[in-house]
Every structure is written in C-alpha cells, then in structure tokens.
C-alpha cells in the first residue's frame, strides 16, 4: 500500500525556518477557533493524526488559502481551521454532502443502526443516482447515513456506479440531526468536484495533497483512481512549486 502525501507551502514561507517562539501563541489563537474539529464522516485513510505536525508550517501561512485537491473527510482542514479554503474531491457525492451542509442541512430521513434500514437506504440512494438526482438534499442525507452505518467508512462503487459498501455491524452509532456548527465553519470555504489538474492555484496557496490509496479495493468513484492518476498528481505539483 502506498500512501502518497505531498505538501506545498507558499514560496517565501517555505524558505523560512519555523519561528517556534511564536508557535505557542499562534496555536493558542487557533485553538480558540477550533471548537469544531471532528470530521462529520468516517473516512478511510483520514489524516487527523497529522494535524499537530502540520500546524508549525500552517501557522506561518494561516492568512493564506488552504487548498486540498483531495479533501476526503476534511480531517486536516477541520484540524487547521483556515479562514479561506478551496476543497476539492473527485467524489461528487462527498462534495454534494458538504455543499448541503454549507446551505444549512438538517436531517429529514430516519437514521437507525439497523441492517434492513441500511439496505433500504442504500437502494434508495442508488435509485437517486440512476435517476440523475445525486445532487439533491435527500442524496446528501442518504450519503451521510450510509457513510456512518456502512463498513469501516468505505466509499466504494461498482462499475455501474452503484454504491456497494456492506453493512457495518457497529454496536452503537451517533447520527447528527443538524449540522449548524459545521455550516458556520464552512461559510468561507469553497467546495468543488473536478479533476485536480483543473484547479487554479495561487503562489501563496498552502497545498495539502493526499490522493486516494493506490490499492485494488478503492473503487473510490465509478471511474476509479489509477496509478497513472498518481503520476499526474506528482507532475501537477511539480508544475506548481
């Protein structure tokens, strides 16, 4: 298994040594804004554990824009809590959920940790996808439920584009009924779903790139994410030093 992590800091910031004398003060100021740090979704390969290691770098650049070409479960972005962010992912269902949270999403479906309900909601979600209604509020809520209830936080689709993650068999699961705290956090963040190579980067952007794993089981989208895509990521970042 390869875990490809690439980090690009603003040019002038990357040339400086970290000012560790100011780090404590910066982290204190940041902590006051960090009342929401826990991701809404379970996400395989989340990098929440890296946030303490990234903070010394981020504290030098926190007035710039944070860019994640593969934002996933938002563990890093929620941990760093930038004022401005460009958050992209090739998974349209993920971005649809975040976009609805930003609008003020509230639960309008029944959510229980029951096998029968899981498969019923999974069938309904796939029916919405087939009907071209993957952008709807209902699809966003179903995606959230399936993520919380499905196996190990996986997001997997078959070749026809159907969500096929099995039931998770957890003892207990907590579900959110509303997402208002996250809405406030998301206000100044831009969410997009496009190929990473089409993102317009600025010289002052702080870029954190964590592409999908290069392993066979990750049919992360209908079209997947191949080794050639991994190479494209590296080449794209080289073009934006």
Question: Predicted segment positions?
Answer:
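SAM-dependent nucleic-acid methyltransferase catalytic core
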Residues: 2-8, 12, 18-51, 56-64, ...
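Short, well-ordered coil/turn elements that cap or connect secondary structure elements
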Residues: 61, 80-82, 186, 239-240
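SAM-dependent methyltransferase catalytic-core segment centered on the flexible catalytic loop
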Residues: 214-241
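Hydrophobic alpha-helix-in-membranes signature
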Residues: 68, 81, 210-211, 240
């Amino acid at each position: 298994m390869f875990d490809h992590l690439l980090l690009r800091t603003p040019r002038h910031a990357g040339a400086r040594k970290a000012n560790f004398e100011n780090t404590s003060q910066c982290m204190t100021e940041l902590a006051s804004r960090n009342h929401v740090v826990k991701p809404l979704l379970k996400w395989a390969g989340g990098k929440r554990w890296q946030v303490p290691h990234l903070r010394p770098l981020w504290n030098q650049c926190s007035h710039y824009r944070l860019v994640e070409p593969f934002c996933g479960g938002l563990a890093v972005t929620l941990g760093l809590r930038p004022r401005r962010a460009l958050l992209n992912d090739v998974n349209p269902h993920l971005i649809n959920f975040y976009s609805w949270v930003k609008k003020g999403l509230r639960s309008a479906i029944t959510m229980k940790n029951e096998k029968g309900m899981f498969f019923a909601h999974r069938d309904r979600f796939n029916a919405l996808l087939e009907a071209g209604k993957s952008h709807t509020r209902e699809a966003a809520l179903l995606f959230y439920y399936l993520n919380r209830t499905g196996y190990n936080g996986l997001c997997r689709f078959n070749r026809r584009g159907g969500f096929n993650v099995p039931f998770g068999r957890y003892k207990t699961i907590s579900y959110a009924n509303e997402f208002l705290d996250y809405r406030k956090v998301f206000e100044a963040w831009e969410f997009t779903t496009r190929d990473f190579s089409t993102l317009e980067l600025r010289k002052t952007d702080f870029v954190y790139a964590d592409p999908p794993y290069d392993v066979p089981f990750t049919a992360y989208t209908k079209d997947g994410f191949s080794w050639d895509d991994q190479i494209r990521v590296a080449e794209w970042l080289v073009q934006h030093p």
